[in-house]
Amino acid sequence: MTHFVLVGDVGGTNTRLALCDAMTGELSQIETYSGLDFPSLEGAIRDYLDSRQVTVQDACIAIACPITGDWVAMTNHTWAFSIAEMKASLGLRHFEVINDFTAVSMAVPVMGRESLLQFGGGEPVPGKPVAVYGAGTGLGVAHLVHVANQWVSLPGEGGHVDFAANSDEEDNILTILRQSLGHVSAERLLSGQGLVNIYRAIVLSDDRTPEALEPKDITERAVNNTDVDCRRALSLFCVIMGRFGGNLALNLGTFGGVYIAGGIVPRFLEFFKASGFRAAFEDKGRFKGYMQDIPVYLITHEQPGLMGAGAYLRQVLGSAL
């Protein structure tokens, strides 16, 4: 009889829930809920299980906020809960709550090559550290290391490190953003709002008034080559993505690969392919040669968070990934 576990991927807007085969990791009965439809995460979970008349003993939920103890309070949603209390209320044997990029990183060891698109470098070295990052509403970051026959995710808040300008143009952007933001983190440039920040800073640097554009407006104008400021902004976004990914690679020597997740890059994939991303990734001065063999992949799988939550829980339950 198939042993199903519950997995979830909770963002600021939507919550995705699914059943996962504890032996194979196969996902089934994926459903997306609006976060506005339920007063609590537990309410969404109960609705999912009750509508299917299914009982589970084990669950893993990936959630877009720091997980530092028993109390979880989402930064971009009103939901908040005690892990221990929800575990008891749902009658679960195992209830794992992990950061969303912990889940994405845990998907890497079980993800097929058909779900990856490579941007330069050689082949990944088995067992070597991995870096995962992705721009969306914010900038998520995690590393993954292989220790004692298990994969261990190293989550953190790497998107909030200082933005490191490395050209005259980037210096100008940093100066302008600092005037309005104070501390300028990498996320202030590598996110949906970050793309808007780059565009505005480019226009302001020429003493002009920027338009009130959304990220999708900037992307469309850049891809269609109808606005030089938008094209400059998106080009610089790609370069900064490369620089930031290169920094992650240097931190742990990620010869297992650097993996890009998040919803932004797939929206302008052809533009990204032709951009200065890879050159910026390798642009580490004396360590350029070190960088050249490190592969970078774009994750194209539709549900890496659910896949990774399943992989994390399966490993907790004793399976080898």
Curated annotation (Swiss-Prot):
HAMAP family: Glucokinase (MF_00524). Transmembrane segments: none annotated. This is Glucokinase. It catalyses: D-glucose + ATP = D-glucose 6-phosphate + ADP + H(+). ATP binds at G8, D9, V10, G11, G12, T13. The keyword Kinase applies. It is an enzyme of class 2 (transferase). It is found in: Cytoplasm. The keyword Cell division does not apply. The lineage of its organism: Bacteria, Pseudomonadati, Pseudomonadota, Gammaproteobacteria, Enterobacterales. Belongs to the bacterial glucokinase family. Its EC number is 2.7.1.2. It comes from Pectobacterium atrosepticum (strain SCRI 1043 / ATCC BAA-672). Pfam families: Glucokinase. One of its GO terms (biological process) is glycolytic process. GO terms for molecular function: ATP binding; D-glucose binding; glucokinase activity. Its main location: cytoplasm.
